[in-house]
Amino acid sequence: MPIEDRDNAYLITHALAKDTLSQLRDIETEQVAFRKGLVKLGRICGYEIIDGAMETEYAHVQTPLTETTGEQVSGLDNIVIVNVLRAATPFVEGLLKAFPRAKQGVISAGRDEAAGMNQDGMFPITIDYVKLPEITANDTVVVADPMLATGSTMCAVLDHVNDAAKSKPKNLFVLSAVSAPEGLLHVGSEFSSADLLTVAIDDYLDDEGYIVPGLGDAGDRAFRTV
């Protein structure tokens, strides 16, 4: 569903996606359930991308009884999923259930928390590791990070994705579970060719750049580092 006043941002409104997100938000959801919830949410979001953005074609099928005509999704061999470490790892695990033949890229990126936000509400970002497959004009690229807060990390990641692309991909999706209005604005304005997909738009960012109400630190909760 398009988001008002944002030409390239869309809400994923599937009932199971919203139900799963509610469980992820709950402070009582422990590590294993949280991680499994991110996997489940990634899978649902993958199916929503297939349903909303990918084409189908007719195919001849031989059943045990006769020959018939069915439909198949085209382009499933031209999917590139970019995992923004580390919080996106279980999220991407779910996406791979929807896109089992996807090529995968990995970018390790993190905020410089000590430096704090600048006057534009952005953090300096440290990129520690980049490994991306070849990206071509036939590819649908999904850059996954459960939390889109200030947009600082995602903007840095997308710079690397664009640098790696031999040509503009067929589709470029930024996928998150929860987004802040500020992050959608920053990323959407700087990368107008990307479609931003999110299950929820939360209220605001606090003074430290965390999404409120949010779901806490997705990486810490998934990997039990708190």
Swiss-Prot record:
Pathway: Pyrimidine metabolism; UMP biosynthesis via salvage pathway; UMP from uracil: step 1/1. Uracil binds at residues 211, 216-218. The keyword Nucleotide-binding applies. 5-phospho-alpha-D-ribose 1-diphosphate binds at residues 86, 111, 145-153, 217. Allosterically activated by GTP. Pfam families: UPRTase. Gene3D superfamilies: 3.40.50.2020. Its cofactor is Mg(2+). It catalyses: UMP + diphosphate = 5-phospho-alpha-D-ribose 1-diphosphate + uracil. GO terms for biological process: UMP salvage; uracil salvage. GTP binds at residues 36-40. InterPro entries: PRibTrfase_dom, PRTase-like, Upp_A, Ura_phspho_trans. Keywords: Allosteric enzyme, Glycosyltransferase, GTP-binding, Magnesium, Nucleotide-binding, Transferase. Its EC number is 2.4.2.9. Binds 1 Mg(2+) ion per subunit. The magnesium is bound as Mg-PRPP. GO terms for molecular function: GTP binding; magnesium ion binding; uracil phosphoribosyltransferase activity. Catalyzes the conversion of uracil and 5-phospho-alpha-D-ribose 1-diphosphate (PRPP) to UMP and diphosphate. NCBIfam families: PRK00129.1 (NF001097), upp (TIGR01091). Belongs to the UPRTase family. This is Uracil phosphoribosyltransferase. The gene is upp.
